[in-house]
Amino acid sequence: MAALTLTIAAFGQAQITTRKEKLSDFTTRTMKVVLSGNHFIDPIIREAVNNTWSLSAFEFCSLEDFNSLKNNEEYYFMLPVKVKYRAESKPGITMLTIVKGRASAKTVNDMVNVVSIPVAAADIPSGREAAMIPGLVDIMQGYIAKSLNGNFSGLRTYVTPLGKSSGRRVVIAKEDLSETVDSTFCRKMARKGLDIVDGEVADSLFLSGDSRTLVSYVVAPAEPEKGSVCWRILIDARTHELFYYRKRTLKKEDEAGFHKGDLKIIANTR
């Protein structure tokens, strides 16, 4: 899956994070949503923004429009950007990023990074993006709304502690498990209250906004390599609260996904 032709080394460390600047004009400005020409991700982003975004006015634009407008400080931009981490041989994941125009900017890296979140593999989709990206867009919106009146201090101030998820159902898609997690361990986790289901079931629960249910999502390269980065995420299907958001740099190709350690941490809060 191609996003933009832009490739970046480590934009904001590929986290939901911001520079410590007060962006108090966000709600009064228009956000340009960049559709890069990719026939897979563009419709998902368009639908997600249309159905979710209410914090500011927005308009859709092309990559060419972005290149001509990026130096205009009257605009914010939401755009998909491929990310290449230092140890990777090629970009592994796509981030959805919101930046502010800057007069001197030559590339995205030169612009004010408002918020960025991993949304998909860089090239080959997993098939779960259509279900999960609307929730990720809503997380970006909620984070900005919370941060408008003060300095941006990063995602860790926005993640809800897992301890507050007791009483909620936890659904882990089988596709989100690391290859190091075997069936015996899965059965053990099921006894501790984790529901491990097919990805289609997880997506259906998320799309229906199932009450008091956390659903997993993993963003990793389609073909991981040593040095690739994997993100493990748990989101409340109804409120889109973010309960788990962790980054792992892979030492082996089979490490992408939720590990036994992740599942133990989550199960201990049941």
Where in the sequence are the language-model features?
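C-terminal/domain-edge helix-coil "capping" segments
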Residues: 13-24, 103-270
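Start-of-domain marker
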Residues: 13-95
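Aromatic/basic-lined ligand-recognition segments
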Residues: 91-109
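A generic structural signal for short, solvent-exposed coil/turn residues
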Residues: 2-6, 25, 52, 226
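Homeobox/homeodomain signature
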Residues: 6-8, 48, 186, 196
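A structural detector for beta-sheet-dominated domains
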Residues: 34-36, 99, 173
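A generic short-segment signal for beta-strand/edge and adjacent turn/coil regions
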Residues: 2-3, 44-45, 140
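Bacterial Sec-dependent N-terminal signal peptides
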Residues: 1-19
